[in-house]
Amino acid sequence: MRWLGYLILAGLAASAAPGGSVTKHRSVFDDLADRARSLPAEFAANALLRLAEAPALTDVAKKRGILEDAFELAAGAQQPFARRNWTGSPGSLFDKAYAQGLDACTLQCRAVHDMLAIDYRKAREMFGEVQPPHIPRLDCEDALVYDVSIFYVTAGEMAARAFNAKEVADEEPFQLLLRYAGDLTSPAQLAPIARMLVTASLKPVQFEALLGSFAGALEQVEGDDRSFSGTVPGDASAAIADLSAECARRKINAQGLQAAWQAYLARQLSGARCADSVARRPQPSLGAGVKPASIDGKAQPAGECKSPECRKLATQFSSLIVGPNGFGLTPEQKMTSEWGGRLQQYLAALAEWTEDDDPVEYFQAKSRIYSDLYNVTPNGPNRDLLLSTLLIWLQGNSYQRDHRVEWFYPVNTLIIHAFADPRGMRRTMLALQRSADPVIALYAQLEQLLPRPMAGTIGLL
């Protein structure tokens, strides 16, 4: 059915007036944009950005207006920044939820990036309204750390592309970067700022000034161990090495940077540490004399299956993947009507599981069970039934109100799965587009009209 989306896009492009405006099919595009604006902030902004990035939208004025709306709406997103598991690898299904690009910082920076292609002055004005990262301290129990790299990538892009020759001569790009080079208050900012400096096109004296500002801030910053251990070893260490190499290439003395880096490591490693951070290998080595002042708790995985009903369903799940002989069921065995009947019984039991005392555990655990079911169910009617059942549960779920990003993650993966198999998932595709939930319906229609490339979605699965 994707041919329909391509036909609509072709119609939008073909109906553009000489000035670039969409005429005949204007209502198709404008209806989607109007519906998007009525959604909660992050869903509205993301949908508008997808529309603004559509190749068929050649009307620059219309695109500009949509980008401005998306930028303003993005400020109301529930999540201020992207997040990731502190180890660098997803520890649970929902760690990926915070990498969907639905946080305020990512959405606003994306709007700025898109605006830069059509109006660099407006893009610069918009970026000036993006709040610089002020990152909350985390506890050892937190499994997710903040990722603000998009902000500093965008700052570097502004310095490189958002100024004319006179403004460059007046050192305005340098002043922009100087504003952020020394504004280091959390370990989560260290690597992004260092990389921003590495890629900056600057005169030697300007580079030295930024380097000095960054090193001075690095010498003073003291962050929580969870944020620190989420970047060292690994991201921060590599970024400092890259910055040192850039200093060598420019023949600039990096001793001040290295001294600040070593002082930073000593300060963090001798402070309060998290138990799982201390146990992690490899550890930065500063000698036997550097020991933690205290060793506290460890990260708590979210959405564990603790309730009796959840544990019961988890036990019953094994009958769908393991036969009486103790061996895993083959794809051929799962294609039988007998297995299909057991799946339907299990789906009925899953549907009867109502919310527990802990809404986070309930939503995450039930979503994980649906995800596991999808992975073991062969293509065909049973998989289509499974996705339809999941849709019914999601579209009436109150979890969306306070946990939009997490609620949308299974919605997003459901849309990706369904539209990746238009023949086998025809019923689910139609149900998604006709959903009573306005977010689900609009995003399904966007997927039909503006399908995302697999490279952009595979990491979410």
Predicted regions, residues:
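Hydrophobic h-region of N-terminal signal peptides that target proteins for export
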Residues: 7-17
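Non-catalytic all-alpha helical scaffold/repeat segments
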Residues: 15-461
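Positively charged n-region of N-terminal signal peptides that target proteins for export
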Residues: 1-4
